[in-house]
Structures are given as structure tokens and as C-alpha cells.
Amino acid sequence: MVTRDVTIKNSVGLHARPATFFIQKSNSFKSSIWVEREDRRVNAKSLLGVLSLGIVKGMEITLVADGPDEEAAIDALAELIDNELDDLK
């Protein structure tokens, strides 16, 4: 199991369009992947789950992956959050 804390930097957070791209990226991996915020954990492959966290700019979330490609999954999702979501407003 691999975990990584990331801070949301894009202006709109993880909702609507950015969340859709996050879910698509999550679904490209075989590992089970979760997003944690405070005391809640949701499936990173579930749009409704991710949207229910109400993730906005400046929030810190934890990415958790467990499976055969867990390292690659965490690296790719952290990269997406850190560098690619601002273009998806």
C-alpha cells in the first residue's frame, strides 16, 4: 500500500470537469485507489464519491493505492493534481 499527501493547487478544485479526468486516470490502473479527506475515504474511481468530498483549492488530500501498479498510480495521480488540472477548468 502506498500513500501520498497532495495539496490541490488548481483554482476550481476537484469537481465537475477536473474530477472527470481524475476518475479516468484512476480507472486506467488495476490497483484499488482511494482519496481521503479528513476522516472520509472514497473510491477514487467513483465520480460521485470524489465529488462528495467537496475538494477545493488549498485543501490537502491523501491518495492511497493498493495493488500491482500502486506506485505508478500514485505518481500519475499526484502529477495530474500538481501540474495538469489547471488546464481543465
Locations of regions flagged by a protein language model:
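Intrinsic-disorder/low-complexity, polar/charged segments enriched in Ser/Thr/Lys/Arg/Asp/Glu/Gln
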Residues: 1-5, 60
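C-terminal structural segments of small proteins and small subunits
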Residues: 56-89
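Compact, glycine-rich, soluble single-domain proteins
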Residues: 7-48, 52-57
